[in-house]
A protein has these predicted regions:
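Cysteine/selenocysteine-centered motifs that mediate thiol-based redox chemistry or coordinate metal-sulfur cofactors
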Residues: 163-174, 251-264
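Short amphipathic alpha-helical/adjacent loop interface patches that line ligand
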Residues: 44, 55, 80, 101, ...
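Short, solvent-exposed recognition segments
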Residues: 3, 133-208
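N-terminal helix-turn-helix
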Residues: 1-95, 255, 259-263
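Extended hydrophobic
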Residues: 182-254
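Amphipathic alpha-helical effector-binding/dimerization core
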Residues: 69-71, 75-170
Length: 264
């Protein structure tokens, strides 16, 4: 005679469902940030009140934060990056690139960002800020669409055309700045980036207006673009002369990190 397995208490089932809902909320914020409560409820099909409770729980635990208080939009907190989650056996990109990022920031006295590709997005994994009063600030853990940044353009310039066209069909997150990117102009930018080795993002950017940036792709040993180094400059300080001076430095920095990856 076999002992029957006792039924799980209803409270235990509710607790598990609550945990799963909270994890789902976390995953969607990480994928779509910055994102609001209503949009989260729609895309997860979880009641708005449950989404709100999950967000507060994750905020209290240090995993999420409000990134746009005025519009109640959420994003991941730096603690997520502090876990150091990465594929076993892979070199630590942040550690390899750290001296290169710091040197580029010192050479230019502008903000430098290191970001890894994650699907349709770039995730900032390291920043080195300038000591200037007016500067560009982007938190570690911030996710931005490939289609909205110079780093993303640099990545796409090293992808097959079919991969780029596939990206164009994906849903884009909403930002305060409209309209969304002009795909005709973006195709021209990608072609130009492939030719010269770096991408530019002007001050009229869809994602960060009043910021100009220069980005170059970092490749893995197989030649696939996996990350970017980006130099971000307030538009009030940016000039074409800086492009001529700084772009070769950004390209050289990305090439050096690519070499370090290949040798590690």
């Amino acid at each position: 005679m076999h002992d029957e397995e006792p039924e799980k208490p209803a409270s235990g089932v509710r607790t598990m469902n609550s945990v799963l809902s909270t994890l789902r909320v976390f995953e969607e914020v990480a994928q779509r940030q910055p994102i609001g409560v209503s949009e989260l409820a729609r895309c997860t099909e979880i009641p708005k009140s449950t989404v709100q409770r999950g967000l507060i729980t994750l905020q209290q635990a240090g995993w999420l934060k409000v990134v746009d208080a005025e519009r109640s939009r959420w994003g991941v907190a730096p603690r997520v990056l502090a876990l150091g989650l990465r594929d076993c056996g892979k070199p630590d990109l942040k550690e390899l690139a750290d001296p290169v990022v710091k040197r580029l920031a010192a050479e230019t006295n502008e903000t430098v960002m290191l970001a890894e590709r994650d699907g349709d997005n770039l995730v900032v994994i390291a920043t080195q800020h300038t000591d200037q009063v007016v500067r560009v600030v982007l938190d570690v853990g911030t996710r931005v669409p490939l289609l909205a940044t110079s780093g993303g353009t640099a990545i796409m310039a090293r992808l097959d055309e079919s991969e780029v066209e596939e990206l164009f069909t994906h849903e884009l997150p909403e930002f305060a700045q409209d309209p969304a990117p002009d795909f005709v102009a973006l195709r021209r930018d990608i072609a130009l980036t492939a030719k010269r080795g770096y991408a530019l993002n002007g001050s009229s950017s869809w994602y960060r207006p009043q910021v100009s940036s220069i980005g170059a792709a970092i490749t893995d040993p197989a030649g696939r673009p996996v990350a970017t180094i980006t130099l971000a400059i307030p538009d009030m300080r940016y000039s074409r002369a800086q492009e001529k001076t700084f772009a070769p430095l950004v390209v050289a920095a990305a090439a050096e990190v690519s070499r370090l990856l290949a040798e590690s």
